[in-house]
């Protein structure tokens, strides 16, 4: 059984990886992925051995709060920004008390200059009050950190909590010594760390605030989509409008869409017209004109006029619901490149705690002065600095932050990745296989020329009258052409359809009732021929002389034109060193012509679904990483076989199960965009990981005091600043993906 839920109380990657590690060891858990950014978890487990309630209990034992839905956070007395501002103010106050005399004695009143026991004690008490206030403002670090430590799942908050608590306890001990006159020399006289506690917490709070704001901005794409989903709709029942919940709408319901309202579910306009904002699908800001017979999609907005529509999907299967599900999956899933960071994070925090304790003991032993309290002070500073400077957050944010921003950017381009692995793998593709109809071409054949042995208007009238009842795209092209030439309609009877061949009916022809046939060449037993040298889709019109003989009256030559800009985008793809193939069920002449005009490397014509499947298998066996680009309708087996499946979707045509990437702008440029965005994202992730590994590799030894003889020791306050800047730098680097642009050359 697969389930998704939310987990509150996670602060860093050590939290999420700890939950994965703990539950992953259980025999009944087949797979689990926990997303720190989304506060979500996807789990697959054996329902015969356990249930979701039992899994929730296991997570609660680890110190976290699993929930089936995210609850609104309790409104605190101070907002995050106010808490941060207060932390800065009180930190400056403590630093002023601690270092004011050092900078200039005139900055402090004489009673606080720490020149004697009384003034030292008074100064320290004021510092303690300021430090306790800052610690209260940052109490979440202590609550979460010690809780995680208690459950043997230490995280970043644990490092902060241990380090600052040790500094506070040491300072309280020094304060006691001053109060009781039990100090040994001038150095140990009132050597407090209250300002270090405050500065560390302030810097960490600043870093976390920047990080959270960036996360929220990156999650805006999903939030904006969810806001597009209306809760109710106007249903027409007995010629009256009834407001109903969207979840109660079923296929076939007639809905009224008012100006300025969102489309509730996918459907088709049956009365009226409108201009719809479909930017959430295609990324294009211009409104799209819709008339009777046109499809409309959930989440899009109607601008001006009202119209009636018939629901073709329920809410669960609507386009908007599928997009939200894809974005959720993409943000919740993990890329393979993140596995290294997860493995390191799983042992990182315990290792740092061990290193800090070892460094403390070593410095206590080897410190150059014989005085114990002086040595203890140096050892404590090293201990706190090592704990505080270590940054599992930089490692944990390196991958998910980049993927989060990349998915937001993708949605603005009309692209949706099924999961993080799809985003990661697209860059590796070296062969792309295209379907032709509806993918490279418009999928709407238009009449190129007409060859007639009878009066042209009569031929058009016969074709129009028979084809008007057909839903086939070729029939629609002929009907549209006949209507443009004002062909009259004839009465038809006895309509018969032979699937894959054509349609016939009895109608008036030259004063008598004749059986007229419209279809491909295999539909006829002609007694005469038509010489047609043009390439294209041939549709013949004839009359049945007998059961075994037909007379051809004329023929239509249709062509399915390539989409605008396809040739240029194919060239862009080939410039990346990618091989291209065209697989189509169309005849050899048409497929060859299309491949030649678009500059595609190879092609297979008259291809059945099995032929396409076999070709992709063959390419994969040769070591190629294959991307299949199709319309998602009849290419499902080929899409499933490919390494990366791209569906050029039109709303409800999307097949989420088959697709790794869905393009709602129905443009081949999306394929190029997906590959380039994948390349940019992985490059960004590697930059983040490089920085995170280098930072921890360099700064942890520095905090241990390896350069002490070079007079380079990091104070706890500087360590706190460095740690904050480390995670902030990863966040800011990830934000650079917002500026990702597709070059047109």
UniProtKB/Swiss-Prot annotation:
InterPro entries to which the protein is assigned, alphabetical: ATPase_P-typ_cyto_dom_N (IPR023299), ATPase_P-typ_P_site (IPR018303), ATPase_P-typ_TM_dom_sf (IPR023298), ATPase_P-typ_transduc_dom_A_sf (IPR008250), HAD-like_sf (IPR036412), HAD_sf (IPR023214), Heavy-metal-associated_CS (IPR017969), HMA_dom (IPR006121)
CDD domains given in the database record: HMA, P-type_ATPase_Cu-like
Key word Mitochondrion present: no
Residues reported in the UniProt entry to bind Mg(2+): 631, 635
Topological domains annotated Cytoplasmic: 1-83, 145-151, 216-343, 398-685, 736-745
Compartment annotation: Cell membrane
Residues in HMA domain copies: 1-67
Positions of the catalytic residues: 435
GO biological process, one term: copper ion homeostasis
SUPFAM superfamilies: Calcium ATPase, transduction domain A, Calcium ATPase, transmembrane domain M, HAD-like, HMA, heavy metal-associated domain, Metal cation-transporting ATPase, ATP-binding domain N
Membrane topology, Extracellular segments: 105-124, 173-194, 367-379, 706-716
E.C. code: 7.2.2.9
Class of enzymatic activity (EC top level): translocase
Primary location class: membrane
MF terms (GO), sorted A to Z: ATP binding; ATP hydrolysis activity; copper ion binding; P-type divalent copper transporter activity
Keywords for this protein: ATP-binding, Cell membrane, Copper, Copper transport, Ion transport, Magnesium, Membrane, Metal-binding, Nucleotide-binding, Phosphoprotein, Translocase, Transmembrane, Transmembrane helix, Transport
Superkingdom in the source lineage: Bacteria
Binding of Cu cation, residues: 12, 15
Catalysed transformations (reactions): Cu(2+)(in) + ATP + H2O = Cu(2+)(out) + ADP + phosphate + H(+)
GO cellular component, as recorded: membrane; plasma membrane
Membrane-protein topology: Multi-pass membrane protein
Role description: Probably involved in copper export.
Family recorded in the similarity comment: Belongs to the cation transport ATPase (P-type) (TC 3.A.3) family. Type IB subfamily.
Protein name: Copper-transporting ATPase
The encoding gene: copA
């Amino acid at each position: 059984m697969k389930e998704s839920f939310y987990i509150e109380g996670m602060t860093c990657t050590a939290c999420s990886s700890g939950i994965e590690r703990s539950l992953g060891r259980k025999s009944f858990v087949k797979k689990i992925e926990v997303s720190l950014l989304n506060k979500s978890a996807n789990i697959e487990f054996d329902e015969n051995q356990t249930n979701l309630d039992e899994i929730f209990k296991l997570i609660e034992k680890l110190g976290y709060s699993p929930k089936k839905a995210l609850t609104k956070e309790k409104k605190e007395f101070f907002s995050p920004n106010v808490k941060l501002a207060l932390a800065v103010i009180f930190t400056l106050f403590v630093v002023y008390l601690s270092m004011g005399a050092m900078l200039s004695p005139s900055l402090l009143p004489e009673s606080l200059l720490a020149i004697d026991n009384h003034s030292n004690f008074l100064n320290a008490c004021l510092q303690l009050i300021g430090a306790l206030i800052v610690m209260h403002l940052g109490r979440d670090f202590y609550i979460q950190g010690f809780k995680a430590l208690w459950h043997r799942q230490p995280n970043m908050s644990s490092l902060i909590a241990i380090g600052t608590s040790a500094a506070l306890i040491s300072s309280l001990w020094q304060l006691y010594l001053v109060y009781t006159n039990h100090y040994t020399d001038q150095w140990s006289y009132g050597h407090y760390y209250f300002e270090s506690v405050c500065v560390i917490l302030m810097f960490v709070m600043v870093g976390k605030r920047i990080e959270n704001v960036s996360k929220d901005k990156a999650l805006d794409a999903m939030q904006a989509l969810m806001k597009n989903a209306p809760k109710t709709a106007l249903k027409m029942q007995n010629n009256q409008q009834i407001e109903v919940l969207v979840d109660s709408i079923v296929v076939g319901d007639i809905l009224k869409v008012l100006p300025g309202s969102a489309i509730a579910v996918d459907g088709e306009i049956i009365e009226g017209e409108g201009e719809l904002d479909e930017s959430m699908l295609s990324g294009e800001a211009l409104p799209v004109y819709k008339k009777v017979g046109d499809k409309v999609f959930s989440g899009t907005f109607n601008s001006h006029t009202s119209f009636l529509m018939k629901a073709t999907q329920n809410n669960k299967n609507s386009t908007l619901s599928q997009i939200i599900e894809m974005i959720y999956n993409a943000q919740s899933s993990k890329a393979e490149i993140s596995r290294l960071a997860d493995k390191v994070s799983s042992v990182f925090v315990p290792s740092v705690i061990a290193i800090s304790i070892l460094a403390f003991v070593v410095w206590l032993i080897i410190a150059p002065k014989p005085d114990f309290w002086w040595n203890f002070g140096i050892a404590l500073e090293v201990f706190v600095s090592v704990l505080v400077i270590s940054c599992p957050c930089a490692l944990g944010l390196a991958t998910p932050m980049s993927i989060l921003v990349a998915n937001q950017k993708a949605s603005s381009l009309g692209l949706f990745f099924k999961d993080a692995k799809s985003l990661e793998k697209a860059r590796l593709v070296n062969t792309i296989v295209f379907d032709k109809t509806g993918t490279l071409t418009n999928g709407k054949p238009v009449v190129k020329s007409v060859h007639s042995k009878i009066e042209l208007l009569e031929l058009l009238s016969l074709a129009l009258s028979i084809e008007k009842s057909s839903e086939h795209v070729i029939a629609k092209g002929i009907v549209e052409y006949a209507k443009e030439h004002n062909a009259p309609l004839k009465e038809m009877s006895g309509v018969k359809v032979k699937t894959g061949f054509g349609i016939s009916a009895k109608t008036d022809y030259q004063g008598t009732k004749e059986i007229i046939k419209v279809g491909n060449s295999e539909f006829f037993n002609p007694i005469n021929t038509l010489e047609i040298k043009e390439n294209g889709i041939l549709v013949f019109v004839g009359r049945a002389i007998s059961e075994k003989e037909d007379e051809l009256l004329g023929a239509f030559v249709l062509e399915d034109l390539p989409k605008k800009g396809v040739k240029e985008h194919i060239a862009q793809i080939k410039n990346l060193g990618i091989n291209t193939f065209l697989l189509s069920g169309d005849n050899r002449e048409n497929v060859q012509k299309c491949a030649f005009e678009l500059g595609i490397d190879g092609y297979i014509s008259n291809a059945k679904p099995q032929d396409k499947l076999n070709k992709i298998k063959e390419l994969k066996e040769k070591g190629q990483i294959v991307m299949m680009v199709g319309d998602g309708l009849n290419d499902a087996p080929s899409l499933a076989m490919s390494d990366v499946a791209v569906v050029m979707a039109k709303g409800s045509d999307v097949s989420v199960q088959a697709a790794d990437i869905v393009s709602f702008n129905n443009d081949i440029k999306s394929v190029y965009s997906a590959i380039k965005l994948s390349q940019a994202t992985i490059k960004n992730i590697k930059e983040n990981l490089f920085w995170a590994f280098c930072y921890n590799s360099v700064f942890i030894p520095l905090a241990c005091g390896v350069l002490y003889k070079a007079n380079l020791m990091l104070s706890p306050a500087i360590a706190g600043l460095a740690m904050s800047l480390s995670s902030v730098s990863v966040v800011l680097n990830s934000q650079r993906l917002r500026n990702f642009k597709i070059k047109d050359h």
